[in-house]
Amino acid sequence: HRHIIKTEDIINRGGATLAIEMFESNANGEIDLKAPVPVFCDGVAKMFNAGDILRLAPGESVTLAPGNWHKFWGENGDVLIGEVSTVNDDLTDNVFAEPIGRFSEIEEDVDAIHLLVSDYEKWNLL
């Protein structure tokens, strides 16, 4: 997925290696399979080839700008990820290459204690 407005720092807070596959956007906002991908790793500007996989050890981070397509997963175990980002509307700022839901469906069996932004409409709090 990519973001329209949001810039985000993704931080591997602990656990295994965080792998991030990266692409840049073309002029139409689609995945560009050839363009280099500029990012900042721990504050240092770096350039990657389209489709490269950046691997972050615990304590390392990457800054992804709007238009950077990214897919991430834990390699060889679970990873605790932290995110610090610019203010945005997560309901409209996420663009997915293939239509998927942002969160998996949850069968609610107790009342919510802490709400996500996307929960407010469901709980009639808007």
Predicted regions and their residues:
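Short amphipathic beta-strand/extended segments with alternating polar/hydrophobic composition
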Residues: H1-R2, L33-A35, R55-A57
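Short, conserved beta-strand element in jelly-roll/cupin
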Residues: I5-N26, V39-K46, R55, V87
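Double-stranded beta-helix
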Residues: N26-M47, W73-L126
